[in-house]
Every structure is written in structure tokens, then in C-alpha cells.
């Protein structure tokens, strides 16, 4: 009996020791579990990422070890959460540090962790420390249960005798073990943003990155879709959507290893960015935001949309302003009288605001084209003798708000600013200067430049507190890559420049929290969730051809809610009707950029009614759940709908792009309705003196019928559109 007691005591002690050695950290939403484990060697590993487990005790069944391949040591390494370089891991590290003594290796061991409630979810903080050097890494995870979104980032700091050099600095590292992986990426160019393409990931690395600095996303966007076991699909299959909150150079690395596991590594692009980190200085990586779904990209997108409106997007719960912009109507050629007339047109159209675009500033070097004036943010006296105050007054008299365009991060060599402060621009010494759009990028790593850029906005709002909106542009990538301010620390330019932008935006947000701003970068070359903490919306593309916009807006909708996406009715592709152009813009945040005088009486009446309908239904469009029903990538038609959270109201958009002769037309099957409710169908946005030919118009159907059988809404007409309102009875 005594021997049995001793044996049981020993077994209990061993069990307790193993439980302590295998500490599990659970990061959970309502649908997803991310399980991390502290192994007996003191290091932190990912043991599970997938559907949420119902039984809390089940997380103890996981082991940090992975299946070995030809290299037996793989079985002991496991999926380390934040692996350093230079030790035993053969694959891409999360962090690479050269210590002050030249040692290039890092191994981090678990110190402690804590969890606390934060707005909308739970924050988990995990502290790691190198056991040979005074270097610490802190991992942050915020899980948003209802939205099924996890946000994660890291901090690196040290207390060595001298600075260390950071060569890699990932936000996180995530692992997947499936038979196959399919990546959807979003390529871009001017007027060709958010173009979707997919491929199967094979052994080795696939890297998506950018090296453009300020206009960073001009060629590729900072988000992706990952299909697990099958290509990502809209309404079925396991998918991950991920995006990094960084307005500069980013890098996504997808590495399939020798045993078929996948590492996903989101990070600042380390290209030309060997960062010198001083003792006790904190290096914070960007936030990586991701969501998982077993029901395709549609559900995953709705997760991100809801999360963004609730927690990330500036004024995500607030209203948005419809507007009339003057750019495509006047370009640089305008005066006070013409602008006053356009403000009256804005009121007549029914929009909330008139937005004055480029060309209003510069005196010694007037901004009459794109060769001069950037940096000199005083109203041009020859065009606008009354300055901004006169424009604000005219807008007020017309009954609309007034907004204005700025590009404060840029400078023309032909400007008083450049004459006074040539050292404020990013320019190479001893080299011929290369100009993009005849301009240079101001060096936002320089605190004096940060003060100047903040002062541009501050001066306008201090002198004109009734200015209601800013369109903030950024047309040039960083060229001539050299910072006069950083001198011998050029490896920090790409990073400190972006951080400088954030410092400016934080000051603006703190002093003017209620002023909405549109993010623009020669179109949609800036579109990330860190910038959108400071902007209410972004300009998707300079391409406003409605057919091209269907593809562009479809792509951006994978990640961003309609509330954040600006779409304007313009004169691009006049072969299409004003109705078609307006219906395409109406699926996002609506605006206009054309002169009313070029519209016929019927076209103007149509636009006025469309604005009124959009305003009446904007809560559904901007704050409802989005369902992408028919993809333009799959054929000659597209359909998208929005449903209110209570399922009492929905708005359906259908677009015929280039139907084939005799093409078979299938019903559009709706989603997001209440199967038991009855819905009255009504086609809206009709041209004057025309009637709907929609067979379902003015009829009532059950939500069940509309979702299972659908509605015959497509036609064989070229560039034809419908907007259909559904109301529960």
C-alpha cells in the first residue's frame, strides 16, 4: 500500500510538472482558436489554428512537435511563434538581429503572459526574452469574438551596451498544415487597382512585396486571400483573409516547407531597411489583421467589414458625405465665379458637399499645372482673390459644405518651400534627380517636416474652421532614396518616414477629431487599415470607367466595407449611360465629378433621384452586410447586395457588362434575407418616363424563395444595370 501511495504521488508530481512545462495560451473568437504552447525547452510554439474547440480541456491534447520529414530534427523544432535567425531553424525567421558584439543569432524563451478585456474583445500579451542577450520581444494579440477577427503585432527592445541592427521584423508568423494552399493576390497599377489573380502555392517561397515607399501599393496591395485545400471561393470552403496595417513597404512571405506545411509571414519589407535600434528603444511592427471562415470569402469579408466599422475605421459608425468634385470638370482652369456656380450645382444635384481639387494654391509659382506650386499652401490670388474664406462663404450661401484637396507630403522644385528648404526633400547627393509627376517626396523622418505637414492642415482649419473635409493625396513613390536628415542611418528611412506620417496624422486626429478625410494616392495606391484609423474613406481609383470600376470595387470589397470606398460618377466611358455609371458608383460611397451642364434634363433628373435614393438607403449600403452574388470574373454579369442586420431591408445591384448573343441568363439567388419573412420587390433608380421591365417588380416573395430560386434580373443588354429595393412586410 505504501509503495502504491509513493507511485501515485510520483505520477501526480510528474503530471503537475508536465502541465507546468506545457503551458497553453488560448486566443479565441466565437469561431476560431489560436493555441500557443510553452514547451519544456521554454520556447513558444503554435499548436493549433482553426475552428474553435467547445471543450476547454481539449487544448491540452496538443503537442508542440510537428511531424518529421527526412530531417529528424524537424520533429523537435515545432512551429515556433516568433523564431529568430541563426540557430537551428532552416526557414524564414520572424526576426533577425545582429547583436552589438556581432552575434547574428536569437533564441527567445517564454517569460510571462497576461490577458485583459479591451474594447470589443480580449488582448493577450506574451513576453519573450533571449536567454543570452538582454533582448525582449512582446507579442500582442487582440481577438474580436463577434467579428471573428484577430489582430496581432510585436515589439522588440533591448538593453545591450550599444545599438543592435534589425534585419527582419515580422508582425507575426502563422502556420498551416493542409494538402494544398491557394493564394489570391491583388495586383495594381494606375487606373488598374485591385486586380485579383490566384495560384497554387508549391514548395518554396512566394513573396508579395513593395519597395515604393510613400505610394507603396501602386503595384500590389497589402492584403491577400488564402484558400485551404481548394482555391478560395465566395460561399464555400476554408479561407483566410489577411491584411497588414502599414502605409509603406510591406512584405508577405508564404513558405511551403519540406513536409508540406505553410508559413505565413507578414512584415515590413526589410529591403534597404537595416534598422539600428538603440538601447531601450522600442521597435513596433505593424498590425496584421486576419479572419478565418469555413464558408468562403464572402463570410470572411463580412467579418472584416464589421470589425472595421466597429473598431478600426475612423468614424466607422458615423455618416458619410455625398459630394460634387470639380477635377474632371475644370482640371486646373477655374476661378471663384466658376466654383461658386459649381457649388450651386452641387446643391441642385442634392449632394452634401462641394470638393475643390488640385490647382488652388501657389503665388510665386502658381499651380496652373503639375509642374509647380506643391509645398506653397496659400490660395492663388490670381484665381482666388478672396482665398479659402470666400469659397467657404460661397458654399454656405449655396447650402453645401466645403472640402478641399491637399498633397502636403510632396513638393515641386518650382516652389518657395523647396527654395527655402531643399534639405527637406528626399534627394540623392551627387546624382541626377529623378522626378515622378514633376515632384519630390518630403522627408517625414524629419521632425521639422512633420511640423510643416501638420501645419498645412492646422493653418487651413484655424483660419477656416468651417472647412468640412480634406482629400489628402500622395501621387509620388519615393525616388532618389536619401534622407539629408538621417545622414548615416539611411537604413531607417523607409520605416521612419512612414512613422513620421503617422505622427502627423495622430496630431491632426487629436486636434480635429471630427473632420473627415479621404485617403488618395494617385488612385488606390494607399489602402491599409493603419491609415484608415485617420481617414474615413479612400479613393479606389482614378479609373472611373464603370465597367473597369466593377472589377476594381469587387476587388477592394474583399477587404474593405463600402463605407470606406469612394466611387464617383464621371465622364469616363461616355458610351455607357449616366444611369449605368451612377448605379456602379452607388454601390460604394457616392460622389460626382462632372458638370451638370453636360447632362440632359432627363439625366439630371435621374441623378437627383439616384442621390435621394442613395441617401435614403445609405444605412443599408454603408452599414449593412454585403453579399457578393455574381462575380464579374466568372462571366458577363455582376451582382452584389446589402442587407440590414435586422434583415428588414436590402438593396440589390445587378449589372450586365458584355452579354453574349443568345446567352443563357440565370436567376440571381439572393443571400442574407430572413427565409420566413416576405419581401416586397421594387426596382428604383429608373430614368424619367420609363417603367421597370423586371418581372418581379412590385411583387412579394418569401426570403426563402429569393435565396433558393432567385430573381430574373439580368438581361442581354450591354452595360445595363438595375437597383432593386427589398422591404420586409
For each feature predicted by the language model, list its residue ranges.
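C-terminal beta-sandwich/jelly-roll accessory domains of carbohydrate-active enzymes
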Residues: 658-729
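Bacterial Sec-dependent N-terminal signal peptides
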Residues: 1-22
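Polysaccharide-binding surfaces and accessory modules of carbohydrate-active proteins
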Residues: 21-35, 44-255, 271, 678-690
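Glycine-rich, aromatic-flanked loop segments that form ligand/cofactor-binding clefts
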Residues: 86-108, 231, 236-249, 291-313, ...
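Carbohydrate-binding surface patches
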Residues: 31, 224-226, 234, 631-675
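Aromatic-lined carbohydrate-binding/catalytic grooves of carbohydrate-active enzymes
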Residues: 315-455, 464, 469
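Active-site neighborhood of glycoside hydrolase catalytic domains
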Residues: 385-387, 419-421, 425-579, 589-594, ...
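Short Pro-Gly-centered flexible turn/kink motifs
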Residues: 103-108, 275-294, 719-726
Amino acid at each position: 500500500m505504501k509503495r502504491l501511495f509513493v507511485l501515485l504521488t510520483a505520477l501526480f508530481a510528474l503530471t503537475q510538472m508536465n502541465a507546468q512545462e506545457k503551458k497553453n495560451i488560448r486566443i479565441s473568437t466565437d469561431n476560431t482558436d489560436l493555441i500557443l504552447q510553452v514547451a519544456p525547452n521554454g520556447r513558444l510554439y503554435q499548436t493549433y489554428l482553426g475552428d474553435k474547440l467547445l471543450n476547454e480541456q481539449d487544448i491540452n491534447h496538443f503537442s508542440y512537435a510537428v511531424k518529421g520529414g527526412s530531417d529528424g530534427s524537424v520533429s523537435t523544432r515545432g512551429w515556433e511563434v516568433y523564431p529568430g535567425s541563426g540557430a537551428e531553424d532552416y526557414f524564414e525567421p520572424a526576426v533577425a538581429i545582429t547583436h552589438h558584439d556581432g552575434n547574428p543569432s536569437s533564441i527567445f524563451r517564454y517569460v510571462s503572459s497576461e490577458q485583459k478585456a479591451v474594447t470589443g474583445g480580449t488582448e493577450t500579451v506574451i513576453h519573450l526574452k533571449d536567454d543570452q542577450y538582454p533582448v525582449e520581444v512582446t507579442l500582442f494579440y487582440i481577438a474580436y469574438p463577434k467579428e471573428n477577427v484577430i489582430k496581432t503585432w510585436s515589439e522588440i527592445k533591448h538593453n545591450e551596451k550599444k545599438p543592435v541592427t534589425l534585419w527582419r521584423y515580422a508582425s507575426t508568423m502563422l502556420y498551416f498544415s493542409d494538402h494544398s494552399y491557394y493564394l489570391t493576390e491583388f495586383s495594381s497599377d494606375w487606373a488598374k487597382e485591385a486586380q485579383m489573380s490566384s495560384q497554387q502555392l508549391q514548395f518554396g517561397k512566394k513573396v508579395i512585396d513593395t519597395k515604393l515607399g510613400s505610394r507603396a501599393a501602386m503595384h500590389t496591395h497589402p492584403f491577400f486571400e488564402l484558400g485551404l485545400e481548394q482555391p478560395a471561393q465566395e460561399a464555400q470552403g476554408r479561407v483566410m483573409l489577411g491584411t497588414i496595417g502599414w502605409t509603406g513597404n510591406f512584405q508577405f512571405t508564404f513558405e511551403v516547407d519540406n513536409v508540406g506545411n505553410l508559413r505565413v509571414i507578414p512584415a515590413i519589407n526589410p529591403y534597404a531597411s537595416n534598422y539600428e535600434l538603440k538601447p531601450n528603444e522600442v521597435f513596433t511592427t505593424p498590425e496584421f489583421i486576419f479572419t478565418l471562415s469555413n464558408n468562403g470569402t464572402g463570410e470572411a469579408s463580412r467579418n472584416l467589414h464589421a470589425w472595421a466599422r466597429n473598431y478600426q475605421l475612423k468614424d466607422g459608425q458615423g455618416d458619410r458625405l455625398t459630394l460634387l468634385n470639380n477635377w474632371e470638370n475644370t482640371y486646373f482652369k477655374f476661378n471663384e465665379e466658376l466654383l461658386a456656380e459649381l457649388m450651386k450645382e452641387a446643391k441642385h444635384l442634392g449632394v452634401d458637399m462641394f470638393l475643390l481639387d488640385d490647382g488652388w494654391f501657389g503665388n510665386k509659382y502658381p499651380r496652373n499645372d503639375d509642374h509647380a506650386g506643391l509645398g506653397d499652401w496659400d490660395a492663388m490670388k490670381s484665381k482666388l482673390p478672396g482665398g479659402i474664406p470666400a469659397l467657404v462663404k460661397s458654399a454656405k450661401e449655396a447650402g453645401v459644405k466645403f472640402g478641399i484637396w491637399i498633397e502636403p507630403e510632396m513638393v515641386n522644385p518650382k516652389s518657395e518651400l523647396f527654395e527655402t528648404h531643399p534639405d527637406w526633400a528626399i534627394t540623392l547627393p551627387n546624382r541626377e534627380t529623378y522626378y515622378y509627376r514633376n515632384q519630390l517626396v518630403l522627408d517625414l523622418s524629419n521632425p521639422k517636416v512633420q511640423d510643416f505637414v501638420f501645419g498645412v492642415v492646422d493653418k487651413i482649419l484655424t483660419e477656416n474652421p468651417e472647412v468640412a473635409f480634406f482629400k489628402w493625396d500622395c501621387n509620388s513613390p519615393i525616388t532618389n532614396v536619401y534622407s539629408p536628415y538621417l545622414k548615416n542611418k539611411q537604413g531607417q528611412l523607409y520605416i521612419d518616414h512612414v512613422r513620421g506620417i503617422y505622427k502627423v496624422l495622430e496630431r491632426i486626429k487629436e486636434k480635429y477629431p471630427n473632420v473627415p478625410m479621404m485617403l488618395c494616392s494617385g488612385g488606390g495606391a494607399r489602402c491599409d487599415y493603419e491609415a484608415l484609423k485617420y481617414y474615413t474613406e479612400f479613393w479606389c481609383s482614378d479609373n472611373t470607367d464603370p465597367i473597369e470600376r466593377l472589377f476594381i470595387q469587387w476587388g477592394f470589397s474583399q477587404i474593405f466595407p463600402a463605407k470606406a470606398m469612394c466611387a464617383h460618377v464621371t465622364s469616363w466611358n461616355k458610351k455607357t449611360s449616366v444611369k449605368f455609371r451612377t448605379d456602379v458608383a452607388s454601390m460604394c460611397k457616392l460622389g460626382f465629378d462632372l458638370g451638370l451642364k453636360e447632362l440632359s434634363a432627363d439625366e439630371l433628373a435621374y441623378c437627383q433621384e439616384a442621390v435621394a435614393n442613395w441617401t435614403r438607403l445609405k444605412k443599408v449600403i454603408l452599414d449593412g452586410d454585403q453579399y457578393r452574388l455574381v462575380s464579374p470574373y466568372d462571366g458577363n454579369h455582376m451582382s452584389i447586395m446589402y442587407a440590414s442586420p435586422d434583415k428588414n431591408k436590402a438593396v440589390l445591384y445587378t449589372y450586365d457588362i458584355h452579354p453574349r448573343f443568345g446567352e443563357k441568363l440565370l436567376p440571381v439567388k439572393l443571400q442574407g434575407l430572413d427565409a420566413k419573412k416576405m419581401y416586397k420587390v421594387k426596382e428604383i433608380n429608373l430614368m424619367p418616363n420609363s417603367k421597370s421591365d423586371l418581372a418581379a417588380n412590385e411583387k412579394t416573395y418569401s426570403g426563402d424563395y429569393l435565396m433558393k430560386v432567385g430573381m430574373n434580373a439580368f438581361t442581354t443588354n450591354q452595360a445595363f444595370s438595375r437597383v432593386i429595393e427589398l422591404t420586409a412586410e
